[in-house]
Amino acid sequence: VNESWVLTAHAATDVEGRPVDGQTVLSDDCEITAGSSVRLGFCVTTPLSASARLSFLSDHRPAGAVDGVVLMAQTCLLGPGPENHVRCPQWPTSVVLVRGRRGLAVKSRKDIFVDGSLATGLTPLSSGQVISGTDFRFRLEEINPER
C-alpha cells in the first residue's frame, strides 16, 4: 500500500522531537507531541492496509472515553494479533471492516453473524447492526458529529 498520512500543524506540534511548520508526512511508529505535553503514538499496523492507529502516550484523553483512534482508509482490522488496528486479545480470529461506495461491509475467515444471520462473503453493514462470532460481539454505531 503506497499511501501516506500527512499531519498539518495548526499550533505547536512536534513529530519525533522535531517542530512541524505546516505539513509533514508521518512515518510508521512515530511520536507526535501536540502543544507542550499531549503525546500520541502513530502506527500503521500492517503494510497491507493504509489505515493507521493513534494511541495516547500521555495521560491526556478527549472528552469522550476512548483509548485510541483509528484513521480508517479502506480497511479496519479487529482481532487478537499485533497487525490489527483494534486489538481484541481474547478473540479467536480477526474481522475486517471494508469501506466501499455504499458504506461499510464485514468479512472474516470464521463464521460471523450480522444481526443473528450468518454473514457470507463481504456483507454490507448499516448503523446499529450487531456483528458477532462465537467469542465476540460488537455493534456498529454512527457517531453524530454535531454532538
Which functions belong to the PLM regions below?
Residues D28-L48:
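Short, structured interface segments
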Residues R53-R61, V66, A73:
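Flexible, surface-exposed loop/linker segments and immediately adjacent secondary-structure boundaries
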Residues V1-D29, A65-D135:
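Forkhead-associated
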Residues G41-D59, R139-R147:
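Short, compositionally biased
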